[in-house]
């Protein structure tokens, strides 16, 4: 019998965990609840359109504005919206009194054109508080029931002072948000914004990702943010709250029905084997083109092991860097051949690392019915990254797990272990994997000889998952192409290299076919002889 090499064993654990029955997962969400009710607000956007903002970037700002407006309760007695456009001068595009419906506002935003001169941010804020929010322009008398809000969007250093005018606005009860883009002067943002500043200052590295802030402002304007707590939902068993919205789910042993609200008890056989699997792939600059090709091969090696069909496994693919791009949704392709071709054709984005935005996209888009997800199917996400995220991941990672998604985190090179753990489902040790070198990815499960399966006499490796894997042939030497890092270790004699596998904590003895494989997690030293290998933290050997 041939023992599993480190990379093959890593894939073994990953694949076996992927396809546990959905009934064992507990939560299985599908239904999105009501939109939030927003507090009556006089809201003025103050938008920088100086020459540093290119026309295509200004279009991105307009998309962001529209997304925020979409979430509001617009009306004379609800939220009123005005917009101030500025550069060297200030132009009021429309006052608070101009539009009483959401449709009118969205149309007005689409018509706005950039001014393309200097950057007089202080002058624009002064105009907003003295003119745009005035009674004559549609502003309502000050009241505890009506909020006064100004959102400033800028990408540069102002040519005038913002400190004093912003202080006067805050003292007058106006809530100021500051959004900075690119090479903006961050001290200026702090001078503008209200306290607490971590809630009122936002920065994005380019206009291409400004849209990701829209959800924050949608939530900020929600009057009712926990519909589960107020009972304003129709979930039969479990209500999972998000600001102004909710998702229905089921307790362990139940699956969600197609209505997205009610639950059915699972069959004794373990429930449906249907799985909706979405890859979230890091396409940041640090990956490099040659390594990105190895990642694509890794994806296709996993696809090779799946039963792809309308009733069994569906696959979706999302790439992220500074922005998030859906390569293809669940259900678009119905054969392995088509999926693998689409993966091979995926182009490399090569920018930043916004893992948090990618996780939010997975929650809000990838696993929705409109994107091909199936009621009752197990939801599995595999996040692949090579570095620290440039945005926050904690909230989105927690929400994905709260919604019952089974989340795996695969890290390479400079990937941060704490972030991998934050993403991974419980038990964490079974759901995150780390390798030191992209070259290893090409070896993981390469041309697997047997499809991993569970047979009548499963091998009880209880610390990871009960499984049996059939492999044929003799134990081969673990050469450089099989190892996960090239860290030399002390010692004389045979060539020794280091393998780090983060698959779990101390595996129990496991019978594989007619051989006995004893593994313990840790640094595994691969000896050139190939008939057995020792470890610094345990032993790994084969016995006939």
From Swiss-Prot:
Keyword Disulfide bond assigned:
yes
Recorded superkingdom: Eukaryota
VWFA domain: from which residue to which, for each copy?
A: 42-217, 276-448
Q: Which residues form the EGF-like domain?
A: 224-264
**What CDD domains does the annotation carry?**
vWA_Matrilin (cd01475)
| Modifications made to the protein after synthesis | N-glycosylated; reduces binding affinity for type 2 collagens.
Q: Which cysteines are joined by disulfide bonds?
A: 228-239, 235-248, 250-263
SMART domains linked to this entry: EGF (SM00181), EGF_CA (SM00179), Matrilin_ccoil (SM01279), VWA (SM00327)
What is an example of a Pfam family matching this protein?
VWA
Alphabetically sorted, this entry's keywords are:
Disulfide bond, EGF-like domain, Extracellular matrix, Glycoprotein, Repeat, Secreted, Signal
Tissues where this protein is expressed: Expressed in trachea from fetus into adulthood (at protein level).
Compartments it resides in: Secreted, Extracellular space, Extracellular matrix
Q: Which positions make up the signal peptide?
A: 1-26
Record's Gene3D superfamilies? Answer: Laminin (2.10.25.10), von Willebrand factor, type A domain (3.40.50.410)
Cross-referenced InterPro entries: ECM_Assembly_Org (IPR050525), EGF-like_Ca-bd_dom (IPR001881), EGF-like_dom (IPR000742), Matrilin_cc_sf (IPR036337), Matrilin_coiled-coil_trimer (IPR019466), VWF_A (IPR002035), vWFA_dom_sf (IPR036465)
Q: Name one GO molecular function term.
A: calcium ion binding
- GO-annotated cellular components: collagen-containing extracellular matrix; extracellular region; matrilin complex
Q: Which GO terms describe its biological process?
A: extracellular matrix organization; growth plate cartilage chondrocyte morphogenesis; regulation of bone mineralization
Q: Which residues are glycosylated?
A: 77, 345
* Known role: A major component of the extracellular matrix of non-articular cartilage. Binds to type 2 collagens and forms long concatenated protein networks as part of the extracellular matrix. Required for the network-like organization and bundling of collagen fibrils surrounding chondrocytes in the zones of maturation and hypertrophy. Required for mechanotransduction and adaption to mechanical loading in cartilage chondrocytes, resulting in an increase in expression of the extracellular matrix components ACAN and COL2A1. Acts as a moderator of angiogenesis in response to injury.
User: What PANTHER family does UniProt report for this protein, alphabetically?
Assistant: CARTILAGE MATRIX PROTEIN, COLLAGEN ALPHA
What's the subunit arrangement here?
A: Homotrimer. Part of a complex composed of MATN1 (via VWFA1 domain), type 2 collagens and type 6 collagens. Forms a complex (via covalent bonds) with ACAN; the interaction increases in abundance with increasing age of the organism via an increase in occupancy of MATN1 binding sites. Interacts with COMP.
Official protein name in the record: Matrilin-1
Q: Quote the gene name from the UniProt entry.
A: MATN1
